[in-house]
Amino acid sequence: MDARTWRLGWRCLLLLALLGSTRSEGVESCEEVRKLFQWRLGGAVKGLPEAPRAGPDLQVCLSKNPTCCTRKMEERYQIAARQDLQQVLQTSSSTLKLLISRNAAAFQETLETLIRQAENYTSILFCNTYRNMALEAAASIQEFFTDVGLYLFGADVNPEEFVNRFFDSLFPLVYNHLINPGVTDSSLQYSECIRMARQDVSPFGNIPKRVMGQMGRSLLPGRTFLQALNLGIEVINTTDHIHFSKECSRALLKMQYCPHCQSLMLSKPCMGYCLNVIRGCLAHMTELNPHWHAYIRSLEELSDAMHGTYDVEHVLLNFHLLVNDAVLQAHLNGQKLLDQVNTICGHPVRTPTQSPRCTFDPSKEKHGMKISARNGEETLANRRKEFINSLRLHGSFYGGLADQLCVNELAAPEGRPCWNGEEIVKSYAQRVVGNGIKAQSANPEVRVRGTDPVVNQIIDKLKHVIQLLRGRSPKPNKWELLQPGSGGGMLENSSGDCDDEDGCGGSGSGEVKRTLKITNWMPDSMNFSDVKQVHRADHGSTLDTTSTGCASGTESMALPLMGTLMFLPWLW
């Protein structure tokens, strides 16, 4: 035999030994075990066996053969086995966790942008149409949309209260500038009396009630949707760091590290053996599966139902139209309101005043928000649909987790020599049990006892959020779905369930039916107490915020003209 043939044969034998395809009989040194122990666990090699020996003190890695392990090594290996399983759990859930967390952040950012645009539209309405009261209305507009954001993102604020507060603060401005224009009372007490009288004299008709209904129907589902996404992240974070029982830890040690004691460092467990161990360890987690599936289904149902007056995007971007209707209604009933206010609050001290008007500061033009033209309409509803379609792929995540870990990470391929808990064999001979707690009564590798309080708590939270999600989903025959009409406005659904209070009809000045385009831009800086200006552009539009208000030029604009300019197709 020449030297080349001898070297090749030696390398083959060495490779077979490293692959764990040979028994540990005849192993004379524990040097490789010592090195791997030090590298993997960072432990000192002092005191570790240099050669295989009897291990009478071992509790899990029992063998009739000499061993390279000690009791202390066994304890360290058991900790490492638990950490290894947690690591593969976190790796397996990382895609799902990233999907939910990124979309939760994107939805929140998009809602923040929607609120800013809706505030801009409302400010534009006053600046272009009711210029005399624009600066005075700015604080109330800002406060209203701040409350909208607080509510959407989970704060304890009441939509009915902030809607009433907005219209209460609007009435004195409308009274002083439209109903009794050119004169005002220097006393704050008189303005406060007008504000307090708003709900009694109803200057805006049923519009505040319509706004309350629309805000309630749209903001609450949006708020619940965001809260549900955050709970989904919490569920994954909790299961990523689940506590494993003592029986599970011993089984993991036996499966993952007991081969090391026989110098079989690169061996992998048999598929059936791995399934029994991991299904036993994750038995309680598997019980999450039906609730997780129902959670995703409930998210989908709520998302599908968020249309028309249930769609926060539609409601926010059309809020200014209802405000315009409210101001017009008060103006049309001016004489009646004048008499009612005089009866309740008395006659004002007639002091001619000049209200501050909108002006445009060109130096602030750089703070404008540019909306670029895009090939498609990427709306919040479309983004929700894409997210739900991706999330649906993970509907059985917890039910198939054990199988996924064994197939993709832990077990040897079928037909290959593998570790069965005692030695290297061609196949696993024990019965393979199914998933779930009930199936584990016959598990030969892991004894599963009782219930897991942490998993039970997660299940309770999922049940609760499922009830919330389903409670926020309107029944199909109650949806106020808005469909594009041939005249450029919106048509009510044919069910007859949608009335004026539902807000299905527009004001006639151009309802915003196609909504926010989700873009990558964000304004450099914005001051939302400012009054806003809109400029036309050939291939897009620019919403500019200025420190003092709107464009100079015509002192007032007719409502139809303002609506036409604001809602031309190029704005979208």
From Swiss-Prot:
GO biological process: regulation of signal transduction
Protein name: Glypican-5
Primary site of residence: membrane
Subcellular location: Cell membrane
InterPro entries reported in the protein's UniProt record: Glypican (IPR001863), Glypican_CS (IPR019803)
Role: Cell surface proteoglycan that bears heparan sulfate.
GO cellular component, one term: Golgi lumen
Record: glycosylation sites: N120, N237, S486, N493, S495, S507, S509, N527
Gene: Gpc5
Keyword field: Cell membrane, Glycoprotein, GPI-anchor, Heparan sulfate, Lipoprotein, Membrane, Proteoglycan, Secreted, Signal
Pfam families: Glypican
Keyword Lyase: no
Disulfide linkage: none
Membrane protein topology class: Lipid-anchor; GPI-anchor
Position of the signal peptide: 1-24
